[in-house]
Amino acid sequence: MFTGIVEEKGTVRYMQLTGESGVLAVKAKKVLERTKIGDSIAVNGVCLTVTSLQPDGFTADVMAETVRRSSLGSCKAGSQVNLERAMAADGRFGGHIVSGHIDGTGVIRSLIREENAIWVSIGTSPQILHLIVEKGSICIDGISLTVAKVEEEGFQVSVIPHTGEETTLLEKVPGDPVNLENDVIGKYVERLDRKSVV
């Protein structure tokens, strides 16, 4: 489990695709501390299992389902990615419950500065949007954020400068994809509600 509090920005060394799956290598520092082969690291919100460790990075296998559902397949050498280790049992719970199981992607529509915040507008599919609620939690590229507005074809979040500096979100431009994970509690509530109707 993760919390959506990014620990550092890593740099992609390579994304080697073979057919529909691949291997991702990332240069990192902080997330390597106490990390072992077999541990989980969220890369742009996607839970990946560390398959090998280097003094300054790690590699992980990326399944075909992950390539299809997330934006990891478009990573290139030099790309910056958000990194977070799985939460330790004695860790602080700073964001919200994040599984690292991406629901799909969205597209950056605009980034607008307003005083000490930046409004980020994201378009996404109806399947993801119907589980997004105003003032609820959403995980965007591994970042725990609060939904400020829900619109007909997307939603908006307001990002403080600190979050912008510590993550890759404000490096995005309109048209860039982002990984989205809906609040897991909302997903279970929606599932139970559908079953009760049947």
Indicate where each model-derived feature is located.
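Conserved loop->alpha-helix
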Residues: 1-198
